[in-house]
């Protein structure tokens, strides 16, 4: 793994873990300016660059700048499926990953259930059962306990990007952006 884009980077916890595992080049991205401030405070120097940007509406110059990083891995932890990162933003970040690169993220277990018809749930199911991603690892784990003490389960997902995702992917599958 050479260059990682950490979407929803927050205060840099994931970046710090990746750095501890020897990842040398990392980019953080979050829509919230306070997240970057928290990262500078809590995890200084972890990211080579940290973008505060709306990935649903990136300016062409920023698309070009991020593309020049030749990202070969996308990570997103505890930020998908609750409206924190919209489907369009996640798909945009995934487009930055080079073919043959990796994507690693976690999602609440119900997002893989066919009864969940939310846009994000449908996006993930369409992607992991498509020619665009090759599922490498899927693991259910207890993410945390609810305030009532009930276990909340998530899936950790790792997949290889096999080909570019078409611009009209969301429209083709009638997925809300």
Question: Could you tell me what each predicted segment is?
Answer:
Residues 5, 11-62:
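Class I SAM-dependent methyltransferase SAM/SAH-binding core
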Residues 56, 108-113:
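Short "lid" loop at the C-terminus of a central beta-strand within the Rossmann-like core
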Residues 61-74:
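A short acidic, Gly/Pro-enriched loop at the edge of an enzyme's catalytic core
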Residues 71-86:
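A short SAM/SAH-binding and catalytic strip from SAM-dependent methyltransferases
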Residues 88-99:
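A short glycine-rich, Lys/Arg-flanked "PGG" loop and its adjoining helix->strand segment in the class I
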Residues 100-108:
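Conserved beta-strand signature within the Rossmann-like core of class I S-adenosyl-L-methionine
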Residues 115-131:
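Short alpha-helix
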Residues 129-177:
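Class I S-adenosyl-L-methionine
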